[in-house]
Amino acid sequence: MSTFKAPKGTYDLIPPDSAKYLAVREAIAAPLRNSGYGYIETPGFENVELFARGVGESTDIVTKEMYAFETKGGDRLALRPEGTASVLRAALEANLHKAGNLPVKLWYSGSYYRYERPQKGRYRHFSQVGAEAIGAEDPALDAELIILADQSYRSLGLRNFRILLNSLGDKECRPVYRAALQDFLRGLDLDEDTLRRAEINPLRVLDDKREDVQKQLGGAPLLRDYLCDACKAYHEEVRELITAAGVSFEDDAKLVRGLDYYTRTTFEFVHDGLGSQSAVGGGGRYDGLSEMIGGPALPSVGWALGVDRTVLALEAEGVELELPSSTSVFAVPLGEEARRILFAKVTELRKVGIAADFAYGGKGLKGAMKNANRSGARYTVVAGERDLAEGVVQLKDMESGEQTAVGVNEIVAELEARLG
């Protein structure tokens, strides 16, 4: 046993469970690639100020959860707690918004880090797939992203998730609501820290998950009652487009999410099988974020879906993903000449796209066949001195148990035909 263990709140992805995570990532990415989204990858750490400005200085993410550190050169950096700010920074730095058609549509996948109290569904290191559409203010774009996320989940076989939808208004109508909410919050029995948060960003209080706080928020003013005509019309079009696409959703007037940059459309995907950590993903529109981090006005929208929580949701529903075997053919050599010849055949099989593995370590027939069984291979190729003297190998169908002799020079073509 190793002296070292994974740090608290983190995990290692190892086979066979890692295959589930790869399948989830691919299921989320596939409809994005099919809808004009290009892949982007950003560093695992950024300037602290990027997140302080973008995510919000009063958010729990920035004040309590960020892994921040100072380099030997004096730079203040942080492990990325979310993906949107990094992707927008990269797009601005590369001038993608000047290169051609808007919106710039990007998708990404990676690990993110937050210093949180570890529990099921909430880790200090977690995996997400995200999508961002940068540089266009269009209800159809908001609807597109919600529909694509719904499509991703359903392609995995997930059914018992809900989509919560709200509008946070814009810079014209939200200040009026903000003032009304602050007046309401000042009359509640809240602790000093929460009252301070209410003065900086009162919407953060609506996102407080503590039961004693939520009980007092029953009569809080609702943002939908303060939306200006433009925001009402925008939100109604998003709702109509989603409905026309056959995607079900629930209006949630108290949905604000945990990041300060959201404007207008905000949404969350929740699964009741996950207990208190019910959100499996979410996103929204962030029309002012580009300007917050020093860029031009670029209205944008995006989401991030949690790979870890999606896997947990699938398990909660009892969904078994159809995962292809990592090995289709397993070669078992008996003797040095067979070892040389079968190793060459395994290499040929791989070149023509057949997943093949080899019995390494000079194990006997019994031990090698155990490995073949464990590999999940459909076929096993066995060869000994007598077989090679006759110019054949033994091809065994691991499902039926049927075994046939096939010419050494024909085995690759035979397996190609069988695996088709």
UniProtKB/Swiss-Prot annotation:
Keyword annotations: Aminoacyl-tRNA synthetase, ATP-binding, Cytoplasm, Ligase, Nucleotide-binding, Protein biosynthesis
Cellular component, GO, one term: cytoplasm
Localisation: Cytoplasm
PROSITE patterns cross-referenced by the UniProt entry: AA_TRNA_LIGASE_II
The reaction(s) this protein catalyses: tRNA(His) + L-histidine + ATP = L-histidyl-tRNA(His) + AMP + diphosphate + H(+)
InterPro entries: aa-tRNA-synth_II, aa-tRNA-synth_II/BPL/LPL, Anticodon-bd, Anticodon-bd_dom_sf, His-tRNA-ligase, HisRS-like_core, HisRS/HisZ, HisRS_anticodon
Predominant location: cytoplasm
Membrane spanning residue stretches: none
Biological process annotations from GO: histidyl-tRNA aminoacylation
Molecular-function annotations in GO: ATP binding; histidine-tRNA ligase activity
The enzyme's E.C. designation: 6.1.1.21
Highest taxon of the lineage: Bacteria
Family named by the database record: Belongs to the class-II aminoacyl-tRNA synthetase family.
Name of this protein: Histidine--tRNA ligase
The species this protein was found in: Streptomyces avermitilis (strain ATCC 31267 / DSM 46492 / JCM 5070 / NBRC 14893 / NCIMB 12804 / NRRL 8165 / MA-4680)
Gene giving rise to this polypeptide: hisS
